[in-house]
Design a protein with these regions (language model features):
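Extracytoplasmic
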Residues: 79-83, 101-104
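Structural recognition of the beta-strand scaffold that forms the well-ordered cores
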Residues: 86, 106-108, 156-158
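Non-catalytic cell-wall polysaccharide-engagement segments
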Residues: 2-77, 94-95, 112-185
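Conserved alpha-helical segments that form or flank metal/cofactor-binding pockets of metalloenzymes
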Residues: 88-101
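A general structural signal for well-ordered alpha-helical packing
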Residues: 65, 84-85
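Glycine-rich, phosphate-binding/catalytic loops in enzymes
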Residues: 103-106, 177
């Protein structure tokens, strides 16, 4: 009886892992192999649409903000940039060493998913505590979620927070509320 339960449990875990892999956004064929290579895409050509922000008087780290913007431009979702600023503020207050239970780093990635997400995003072996790796994986995930949600920001935010088939009015409300506190620097 226990043997059967173990087999069923292993099957369920395998199924969930397969489904999680299918639900993640697909990566571009030309994904960089290291985070350092992603900085090569950061170009001064992007500066025309870039805005340096603060939230409620807290100035954000310029280098991280610029890097995030360039990653979103590379993925064709630069319009999402102000929302991304607010979402990361909601997640960690832009603190790269933030920890909340099983969530770590700037974008509060779950440790159990990090290795797979980083590899799928094109940066296998990336350190979960590296803010540039966090921003790279975050922008990869959000561009996929935005595509899957047909550009619906609330749906994409919920997908990031709870998973593909979930919705959270509370989380979306918190992120959207920070939009009122964005200040141009």
């Amino acid at each position: 009886m226990i043997y059967r339960l173990l087999i069923i449990l292993l099957y369920i875990i395998s199924y969930i892992a397969d489904m999680a892999g299918q639900m993640m956004p697909q990566i571009a064929e030309t994904a960089p192999q290291t985070v350092e290579q992603t900085t090569e895409s950061v170009s001064s050509d992007y500066s025309r649409g870039f805005t340096h922000y603060a939230i409620a008087g807290n100035v954000l780290p310029y280098e991280w903000e610029w890097y995030l913007y360039c990653q979103l431009v590379d993925r064709g979702v630069e319009w999402f940039y102000p929302y991304a600023i607010c979402q990361i503020w909601q997640e960690s207050r832009w603190n790269a060493s933030s920890t909340n239970g099983k969530d770590h780093g700037l974008c509060q990635q779950k440790g159990i998913y990090w290795d797979g997400r980083a590899a799928n995003a094109g940066i296998p072996g990336a350190d979960i505590w590296d803010p540039y790796a966090q921003l790279y994986v975050y922008s990869w995930m959000m561009s996929g979620y935005l595509a899957a949600a047909g550009g619906n920001v609330g749906r994409a935010l919920s997908m990031y927070y709870l998973g593909v088939d979930a919705w959270s009015d509370e989380y979306v409300g918190h992120v959207m509320a920070w939009m009122d506190y964005l200040e141009v620097r």
